């Protein structure tokens, strides 16, 4: 059964966050969520209960750093940035995802197999 609209596939949240920060540079949590929603054409929505624990976990692993700043609407916000270690992890996770997507594509195209 496919995940309900808006849910991130299990195991892809770190990849999505790392890639978003790699593409756009420092962003606050709301900015990350908005960008993911925009790029996915509203298919994926990162809620606070999912996103902020992930950001904390990524920071604890040394893949991102955070720093307080002021948002466009003059509010205090924590901005997250990708680290060198985070870029390496992004490359690893991207390669793993591409391998798995290839396997799934082959399985879906294997009509009559089995």
Name these PLM-found stretches.
Residues 82-86:
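Accessory beta->alpha helical hairpin/"wing" motif in late/C-terminal subdomains of nucleic-acid enzymes
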Residues 87-114:
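Amphipathic alpha-helical dimerization/coiled-coil segments
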Residues 51-58:
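Basic amphipathic alpha-helical segments that dock to polyanions
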Residues 12, 16, 77, 81, ...:
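Amphipathic alpha-helical recognition patches that constitute DNA-binding helices
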Residues 6-50:
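N-terminal helix-turn-helix DNA-binding core of bacterial DNA-binding proteins
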Residues 1-3, 80:
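A positively charged, amphipathic N-terminal helix/segment that binds anionic biomolecules
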Residues 3-6, 68-69:
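Short beta-strand/turn micro-motifs at beta-sheet edges
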Residues 59-75, 81:
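Beta-hairpin "wing" of winged helix-turn-helix
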């Amino acid at each position: 059964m496919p995940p309900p609209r808006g849910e991130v596939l299990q195991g892809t949240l770190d990849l999505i966050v790392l890639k978003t920060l790699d593409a756009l540079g420092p962003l606050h949590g709301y900015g990350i969520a908005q960008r993911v929603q925009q790029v996915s054409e509203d298919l994926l929505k990162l809620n606070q209960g999912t996103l902020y624990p992930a950001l904390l976990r990524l920071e604890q692993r040394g893949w991102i750093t955070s720093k307080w700043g002021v948002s466009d609407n003059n509010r205090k916000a924590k901005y997250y940035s990708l680290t060198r270690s985070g870029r390496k992890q992004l490359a690893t996770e991207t390669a793993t995802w591409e391998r798995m997507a290839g396997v799934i594509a082959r399985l879906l195209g294997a009509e009559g197999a089995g």
